[in-house]
Amino acid sequence: MFNGRLKLVENGEPKSDLSRPSGRNAMIVGAGIMLSRLSGLIRELIFAGLLGTRVAADAFKAALQIPGLLQNILGEGTLSASFIPTYSRLIDANDDKDEPGLVAGTIVTLLGLITSAIVIIGILAARPMSKILLPLLPDETFELTVNLVRIMWAGLGFIVLSSWCLGILNAHRKFFLSFAAPILWNAAQIIFALLAWAQDWSNASIAKAAAWGVLVGGALQFLIQIPLVIKVSPSIKLGVKKGSDAVREIISKFFPAVMGRGVIQFSGFLDLFLAGFLATGAFTALSLAQIIYMLPIGLFVMSIISADLPEFSRDRDNISAITTRFITSSERIAFYLVFSSIAFITMGEPLIDFLFERGKFTSEDTLYIWIVLAAYSLGLYATGMSRLYQNLCYSYGDVKGPARLAGLRVLVAGSVGFLLMFQLDRFAIDRNAIIRIGDFPSFTPCLLYTSPSPRDRSL
């Protein structure tokens, strides 16, 4: 197994390069993520005005999840676990200056072959795959979803390859471009959707135009990073380098990481599956709530952990340096996420009103999404800290531990969600009020003496 070498030694202990503070790198990452998230938020604002929470919006959100399986399983999370720690140590070693490029070329070659095969299968099997993963969609929504899935697959394939670029650039401490590149992905969707709207196309046609934006934007997000990747690692050569300990180490960690990401992705599809039991608009409500919920995760947590992962990997033999970085990062995460949770729960309604309530997006939609956002916010801090612990495990080569814990999390979340959704299904939103429209299935004996009139049960 490959073991990187730290260049500096002090009193027999490897010395960390603390002259490169993770806080500065986190600010650079945060700037890129902020611009990217802002463009994503603008995209959602425009789509909400164009499509609301109706059939075309549900179809677009559901369709994006299926090829998104490829991105989430093979993309940034998996490469963070398997590729970045090894590659970061490799570029600091003195043994062979060409080896990092050869290893990186091998990984992108294998990743490209796997991604291409999955994209082709996904396009050909879009209908049965959609039926299996989203079996409860209404017929009208399902047919549109299948068409959108076929268009989107190639775009998400390009985004997987752009995650490889992100890994290369992060390891070389070039953070901004890779995190700002998704602006092009969002911009392409916005432009295509607005062009369709300007031509007075139907909602379904606007959704199809946005799907083509997903494809074009994915290609642009990948291609814009290539020049800088070649600049920082000019020795990259496509092909498979045989007999490399570093390649073997990356591959040995890749498949457990894929399993871990698969478990997390299953959680997302479980949400979609359960939402299929609910009324039209449930997919869109979950998606919009997740976008707001993920803002502090993306802006604060991802900026911190993305800057820390290469340094954790380089400093893993220096316990004091690791401890200092971990404590500093955990304090930052706690500060940002606790405040964000309180803000989302107490001020979520006016925030959603300000962001989305226009066009076909109504005040009832605002209340609906606020409730979903408030529920998500209860786990915001735990989600952020789990990412930090996960990175620490990855830096020491442990990808199986986070995968097991992710499986436990999905089991608990799925069970609780399955039980509660049938209880909360007895609530409805009517004229900006939450009313109960029936007895709770599991607790009916407790409600024998309650008034049968739902109008008398307003909350």
Regions found by a protein language model. Give the residues of each.
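Membrane-embedded alpha-helical bundles of multi-pass transporters/translocases
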Residues: 2-455
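N-terminal low-complexity segments that are often proline-rich with Ser/Thr-Pro
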Residues: 457-459
